Amino acid sequence: MNDRIYIEAARAALARAAWVRGEAPAYNEDAISDLLADLRHLCAATDLDFSRCDRVAAMHFQDELGGVS
């Protein structure tokens, strides 16, 4: 996959989260923070380890950048 697909997936997640809340879509730091908080709530409710998910996501991100840190 390429960056465009990753970015579109993230934008779609932000738009859907805003829609569920009855808000206009936003693509700024506040919107990203809200979505991350929503994901923390989901992890807590379903007994998933958010910190582990975040670490794995960071590894995936580095791999997708070609291992550049």
Task: List each language-model region with its residue ranges.
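N-terminal acidic leader/helix
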Residues: 1-30
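Short amphipathic alpha-helical "recognition" segments used for binding
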Residues: 12, 42, 66-68
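Short acidic/histidine-centered micro-motifs embedded in hydrophobic/aromatic stretches
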Residues: 56-60
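An amphipathic alpha-helical micro-motif enriched in hydrophobic residues
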Residues: 28-55
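Short intrinsically disordered terminal tails
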Residues: 1-3, 62-69
